[in-house]
Amino acid sequence: MLEIARTAFLREGYAAASMSEIAAKVGGSKATLYSYFPSKKDLFAAVIEEEVQQMLAPLFEMDETQGDVRTVLERFARRFLDLLLTEDTVAFYRLIVAESARFPEIGQAAYQIGVQHGLDHLAGYFLAAMERGELRRADASVAVAQFLDLCSGELHRKRLFGVVGADDRDEVEKQVRNAVATFLAAYGAVQARAARLRSSAP
């Protein structure tokens, strides 16, 4: 059911997708579809949640205990970009952005289900790294948002405009190295030690 709805939303857009047509392709009645999903918004939210879970699964399966903070962040950034640049992710991103102007609840749902979930997961790692002295103590939620923006950056914009493809490894590796280096220049262990020295100074 969700796969059929997913195809309809990507092909027709949220506004034009018909619950009746989706029900017909599923093989049941419209009433049956509404018994599972009371509204088209609920169905779309379920599709987004399913899509996000599949997209983010490789990130949440990462073993964050293996390697120093630079290694872990580079591994995360690489997987994050690999997911962000896929055809499916780009298609859903464009769909959500296009529909959010008319249906702001769609954008809000996508943010809570996808973006916020990812932010919360990574914030847990950042907090632990701050406790270990590997990162400078700071607001973890702000640090995560800044790190993810550094990861996506210009490469994501190029992908959305069709300048690069999903499998441009040289561009991905360049973005990963630059993002992690810039982030650690602000939040890394040297900055953490300097902050501790300042706080202990008479």
Label every model-predicted segment.
Residues 1-9, 80, 183:
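Short hydrophobic clusters on alpha-helical segments that form packing/core surfaces
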Residues 4-42, 46-47:
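Helix-turn-helix
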Residues 19, 41, 45, 66, ...:
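Short, structured helix-loop boundary elements
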Residues 47-76, 84, 88, 122, ...:
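Amphipathic alpha-helical linker/stalk segments
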Residues 56, 82-127, 169:
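Short secondary-structure transition hinges
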Residues 71, 75, 79-81, 120, ...:
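C-terminal peripheral helix-coil segments that are non-catalytic and often amphipathic
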Residues 136, 140-144:
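Membrane-interface starts of transmembrane alpha-helices
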